[in-house]
Regions:
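N-terminal positively charged helical leader segments and presequences
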Residues: 1-106
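Short active-site oxyanion
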Residues: 22-24, 43-47, 139-141, 165-167, ...
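Short acidic-hydrophobic, aromatic-tinged amphipathic segments that line or gate anion-handling sites
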Residues: 27, 69-73, 167-176, 234
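Structured adenosyl-cofactor binding patch, chiefly the S-adenosyl-L-methionine
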Residues: 34, 39, 134-135, 156-160, ...
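Short, acidic/turn-prone active-site loops that include or flank metal/cofactor-
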Residues: 52, 73-76, 146-148, 218, ...
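Short, glycine/polar-rich helix-capping loops at beta-to-alpha or helix-loop-helix junctions
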Residues: 56, 148-154, 220-229
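RNA substrate-binding interface of SAM-dependent RNA methyltransferases
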Residues: 106-196
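Active-site/ligand-binding-proximal alpha/beta "capping" segment
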Residues: 118, 189-242, 246
């Protein structure tokens, strides 16, 4: 008599997420998991937790009808990368669907700037930018479908809960996105070290206008064609000994300046 494999297939489908399949992904870390559980628009499949971490979540409504597997800390390695700082929590979810750019522009409160990322691929940077957008009043963060970081557990953890509240959409064509924003009367401002205008000086002249900031990847910065489509190119005034900023730091400074001067 051969061994049946059915007993395995009946178990909860805890799978290590991959960059090739985004139908389901694993979120991890306390703030990321707590925020996802509190988001009624997030499709959730199951929760993996240590007993202590599960107790810390408290009595969230969605925990009452959610499959929960209480495990030891070492068991997370079966589902997550060994470098994932999970804090005793992992949540299997479907990636968020924020709809189309048109949906966003037609339904979102236009108060607050939009941040566009031109080939920013590092998930830690993108997550940090989304976090800054929530804290400093950014309306949304937009990027390129093929050249910006996708939603992953690491990105969502870096956003520290903000990912569930700040729209993050990607589009196939950044140039077309810029055209769409211009049609909606947004002023397009590119951040670039070669910009002839200082960021704060420009913002003082753009009060009560809709603004979209574009930031490029570290190293290469904004692409040539992206620069050509901007209404303005500006630089952040820094000390000469520090003329290149991390893109997430640059985004935070830009959003703070916009909040203060727009």
């Amino acid at each position: 008599m051969t061994k049946s494999k059915n007993s395995k297939t009946k178990q909860p489908n805890f799978k290590r997420s991959s960059r090739q399949n985004f139908d389901k992904i694993w979120l991890f870390g306390f703030h990321a998991v707590q925020a996802a559980l509190s988001n009624k628009n997030r499709d959730i499949f199951q929760l993996l937790a240590t007993k202590n971490s599960l107790d810390k979540l408290g009595h969230l409504t969605r925990l009452t009808d959610l499959p929960i597997k209480v495990v030891k800390p070492t068991e997370f390695l079966k589902y997550l990368d060994e470098k994932s700082v999970h804090q005793g929590l992992a949540l299997e979810v479907k990636p968020l669907d924020w709809g189309s750019i048109d949906d966003l522009l037609n339904t979102q409160n236009p108060i607050g700037p939009i941040v566009i990322l031109d080939r920013v691929k590092d998930p830690q940077n993108v997550g940090a930018i989304i976090r800054s957008a929530e804290v400093l009043g950014g309306q949304a963060v937009l990027g390129s479908t093929h050249h910006c970081a996708k939603e992953t557990g690491g990105l969502v953890k870096a956003a520290s809960g903000a990912f569930e509240r700040v729209p993050y959409l990607t589009v196939p064509n950044i140039s077309r996105l810029i055209e769409t924003l211009m049609e909606k009367e947004y002023t397009i401002v590119g951040l670039d070290p070669s910009g002839e205008t200082i960021l704060v000086d420009l913002l003082k002249s753009l009060k009560n206008q809709r603004i979209a900031f574009i930031l490029g990847s570290e190293g290469s910065g904004l692409r040539y064609l992206t620069k050509k489509r901007c209404d303005h190119l500006v630089q952040i005034n820094t000390r000469q000994t520090l003329n290149v900023l991390n893109v997430s730091n640059a985004a935070a400074i830009t959003l703070f300046a916009a909040r203060e001067f727009l």
